[in-house]
Amino acid sequence: MIPLTLSSPSLNRLVLSTSRYSHSLFLSNFNSLSLIHRKLPYKPLFGARCHASSSSSSSSSFTAKSSKEIRKAQTKVVVDEKLSSIRRLFSEPGVGIDAYIIPSQDAHQSEFIAECYARRAYISGFTGSAGTAVVTKDKAALWTDGRYFLQAEKQLNSSWILMRAGNPGVPTASEWIADVLAPGGRVGIDPFLFSADAAEELKEVIAKKNHELVYLYNVNLVDEIWKDSRPKPPSRQIRIHDLKYAGLDVASKLLSLRNQIMDAGTSAIVISMLDEIAWVLNLRGSDVPHSPVMYAYLIVEVDQAQLFVDNSKVTVEVKDHLKNAGIELRPYDSILQGIDSLAARGAQLLMDPSTLNVAIISTYKSACERYSRNFESEAKVKTKFTDSSSGYTANPSGIYMQSPISWAKAIKNDAELKGMKNSHLRDAAALAHFWAWLEEEVHKNANLTEVDVADRLLEFRSMQDGFMDTSFDTISGSGANGAIIHYKPEPESCSRVDPQKLFLLDSGAQYVDGTTDITRTVHFSEPSAREKECFTRVLQGHIALDQAVFPEGTPGFVLDGFARSSLWKIGLDYRHGTGHGVGAALNVHEGPQSISFRYGNMTPLQNGMIVSNEPGYYEDHAFGIRIENLLHVRDAETPNRFGGATYLGFEKLTFFPIQTKMVDVSLLSDTEVDWLNSYHAEVWEKVSPLLEGSTTQQWLWNNTRPLAKP
């Protein structure tokens, strides 16, 4: 799957930001709340406006245009009843705002969200996974990144202005709001849907024009107009993630977390990222499409822990599992009471402002101010702990730092790596059956649509042991649709698979023991010289990154150019990152690591991390090319160790043929030809035993034959 232009949940920060780097890591002092910011290797908290000009041959405009302007054939102005309805609420008692911001995220800053929380999609009609909508009394604008420009052009009606975030001349959402509102405007947000960092930066930018940020705790305006048609919240049962896949029991994970809490000089941590909660507790859910997580919050203290979750999802088995780990259950909606209770007992709270919503942090701030008078105001001693009946003895305070779970989860243990390797091989077998079927059908001139193809792939995957779900919506794009980077085919509007055009398929699966993500681009007939050249240069970038060796401590952005260099040589590029982290039977997009041109992410790649390798090239309204494998970061064997440094490299997890018909061999070096032939030999060796007794094995043999050197 395409890496986010910034690491998830980044687009809020991208469109609200005013500088390339995170400059507002500190919120205002909490008066009596002692606030410290601890620096760790960290992903960028806010995206920047991209000032570099594009070198792509893309025909997309760099400036903001309304959807009406893009579709000139549309002459009738659309009366958007949803916009009219939400604007009427601006003047309601307790609201009183001039603009309202609707982000993509839920209260946990999730990339994928339950249908009932898809508020931005509901209000705008744009269904891409990343974007921010802003509605004023007379304007409506939507920001999204380069993966979704073409999709947004198609889906937005003429009432909306499309803002191509990151392109030169395009303001961020906060800048635009500050400019279009009359001085003294009031900008409303749902504080549960914004990270504390994003809210603080927004507040700073609009304050320059004397605007006020208003937290609407008690009402979400989109929910008010959605009403009875809004889907119900998910209520599926939670399951235990088996220790043979997790590799580490809950007690061990909590012990490590508590040690880190105390090392930071704190006594508790509040966790809202759903994959972090699932990982720590060895639990999995199905509340969110494509991600095996459940809606919950987790508070871990030195001597106790509370899970805030809908109790109807908790089976007897899961209750026993949590009880054995010393975890008490609390209602999901009582999280703010839980935060208040921490302050009342004088907790020293570790908070990650890039992931915690501003409702939680503001509640803790207010509670600390309220309860601090109950403590010795002159006490400057370190935190001391008492038993749970007595509570804490220190003034309540907080420290901002990256969640330690993010790092622990990113570095896979042996059991997690084993599960990832095994699940990838089963996935490869399913893919082989699928591609063999698809090629045969296309050659028989079957009338297949992009949706037909995606549905059939799901059928093949569902036959594999341990299959749970897809890991994201399958990107099945024929011809020009392949250039829509996060294209999602719909039954009523998708294209037929055209054998005379390139076909791009980006797909993945969730298995009980691992998560997969793979992209292949093929031609069912004869590709043009242009298509072969572009494909080959993408392949060269893929090989260059796969073969990279680098010193320990190297951040991902240093490697990004490896994947682009071959394209750069002929003046081409692509508008997305090259690699994202991947969870082990968890989110297909995982931080803090990434491989991207955005050099604000200083997170070093470390042994045990998993990243994708997916360079691409796209010509709008023509074709798209992408080649993606998943890689495991591991120690590299080098003849020297300069300065005593450890060097790292990559081990492939994905084993599936790359179509050699698309390769212009004359462009490849001998080393690159050897890489491709060696890779295909490994594919045959590892996957063919899973295809014994099937005609698909012959298909795999045909597609893994060595490529002759020129």
From Swiss-Prot:
GO terms for cellular component: chloroplast; chloroplast stroma; cytosol. It comes from Arabidopsis thaliana (Mouse-ear cress). A peptide binds at R147, H486, H580, H589, E614. Its main location: plastid. It catalyses: Release of any N-terminal amino acid, including proline, that is linked to proline, even from a dipeptide or tripeptide. This is Aminopeptidase P2. Disulfide bonds: none annotated. Mn(2+) 2 binds at D517, H580, E614, E628. Residues 1-79 form a transit peptide. It is found in: Plastid, Chloroplast. Mn(2+) 1 binds at D506, D517, E628. Keywords: Aminopeptidase, Chloroplast, Hydrolase, Manganese, Metal-binding, Metalloprotease, Plastid, Protease, Transit peptide. GO terms for biological process: proteolysis. Its cofactor is Mn(2+). CDD domains: APP. Belongs to the peptidase M24B family. Homodimer. Catalyzes the removal of a penultimate prolyl residue from the N-termini of peptides, such as Arg-Pro-Pro. Binds 2 manganese ions per subunit. Its EC number is 3.4.11.9. GO terms for molecular function: metal ion binding; metalloaminopeptidase activity. The gene is APP2.
